[in-house]
Curated annotation (Swiss-Prot):
Family indicated by similarity: Belongs to the SrkA/RdoA protein kinase family.
Chain's role: A protein kinase that phosphorylates Ser and Thr residues. Probably acts to suppress the effects of stress linked to accumulation of reactive oxygen species. Probably involved in the extracytoplasmic stress response.
Transmembrane portions of the chain: none
Assembly information from the UniProt record: Monomer.
EC identifiers of the protein: 2.7.11.1
Family matches, as InterPro entries: Aminoglycoside_PTrfase, Kinase-like_dom_sf, SrkA/RdoA
Gene of this entry: srkA
Catalytic activity: L-seryl-[protein] + ATP = O-phospho-L-seryl-[protein] + ADP + H(+); L-threonyl-[protein] + ATP = O-phospho-L-threonyl-[protein] + ADP + H(+)
Protein's cellular compartments: Cytoplasm
Name recorded for this polypeptide: Stress response kinase A
UniProt KW Translocase keyword: no
Length: 328
């Protein structure tokens, strides 16, 4: 099965119900789809009125070993009293298979949206990220990747070169902006950071609030620098971001040491995410869900904006990184 051409069109509701029934779960409600483009995720209630979420993994994105590492990390975090959504085991197995689809079942965890502009909530998140990374430092992922330039920049650049989605009249300017951004990131990238297991996609949308934070969706977990799990929480102008980062770090360091030199990786990581995200959209374009939900990807205005965004981010990389107050 070719990853780029795969769709979930064969994953019918009956297939999902049968997969759950094989594990002794009888669905007593409908299957409510949750917001996920990469995988297929559904919330439901069983006959005992317990609420669960079932997640069907996109084939060939992660291997079984890589998914199991994600599950093992989540279970270790729960054991260390870090609030994450961890998979349910059936006969000792968290990774299940039905008709060629890998899937897992999670308890449904409700909660309010995390308020990124709430300093008290930000402090609590920083504290639990410190605890998460305390667990993350105990060992590294063996099968899951480490954040680096090849996956996030070099491979996407090759994809852009051959892409037919980019309007022909705009492609040269877009590739030039991409090359300038890659050069700027490469000049500021460091390979000497301490590597640990990360959440990997720790933004406000992946944190629920229930008298404290609840971290969800470890699908992008990988090895990398600690700052990767901090920088996406920052918002607002430089002064606001400085205050937020200082709040996070102070709480974080109650449990884990933080290397402030990693702050210099924030803008390189932001640039890498911009490039990687666009490549992800293009790789998934054969899946009907993507043209339906991202129709603007075929428009000239979108590519003009992307080109301008890449040029602007390359300029940002020439500026001094975010500075903390002298006490740090």
């Amino acid at each position: 099965m070719n990853n780029s051409a795969f769709t979930f069109q064969t994953l019918h509701p009956d297939t999902i119900m049968d997969a759950l029934f094989e594990q002794g779960i009888r669905v007593d409600s409908g299957l409510t789809p949750l917001n996920s483009y990469e995988n297929r995720v559904y919330q439901f209630q069983d006959e005992d009125r317990r609420r669960f979420v079932v997640k069907f993994y996109r084939p060939e994105r992660w291997t079984a070993d890589q998914i199991l590492e994600e599950h093992q990390f989540a279970l270790q975090l729960v054991n260390d009293e870090v609030p994450v959504a961890a998979p349910v085991a059936f006969n000792g197995q968290t990774l299940l298979n039905h008709q060629g689809f890998y899937f897992a079942v999670f308890p449904s965890v409700g909660g309010r949206q995390f308020e990124a502009d709430n300093i008290d909530q930000m402090e609590a998140v920083g504290r639990y990220l410190g605890r998460m990374h305390q667990t993350g430092r105990k060992q590294l992922f063996i099968h899951r990747p480490t954040i680096g330039l090849n996956e996030y920049l070099i491979e996407p650049r090759k994809l852009f070169e051959d892409a037919t989605l980019i309007p022909s009249g705009l492609k040269a300017a877009f590739l030039k902006a991409t090359d300038e951004l890659i050069a700027a990131v490469t000049a500021h990238w460091r390979e000497d950071f301490t590597v640990l297991r990360l959440h990997g996609d720790c933004h406000a949308g992946n944190i629920l609030w229930r008298d404290g934070p609840m971290f969800v969706d470890l699908d992008d977990a990988r090895n990398g620098p600690a700052i990767q799990d901090l920088w996406m929480l920052l918002n607002g102008d430089k002064a606001e971001q400085r205050m937020q980062l200082e709040t996070i770090i102070e709480a974080y360091e109650e449990f884990s040491e933080f290397d402030t030199a990693e702050i210099g990786l924030i803008e390189p990581l932001r640039a890498m995410r911009l490039v990687y995200y666009l490549a992800w959209l293009m790789r998934r374009w054969a899946d009907p869900a993507f043209p339906k939900n991202f129709p603007w990807l075929t428009g000239e205005d979108y590519w003009l904006r992307q080109t301008a965004t890449f040029i602007e981010q390359a300029k940002v990389l020439q500026e001094p990184p975010l500075q903390l107050t002298p006490m740090y």
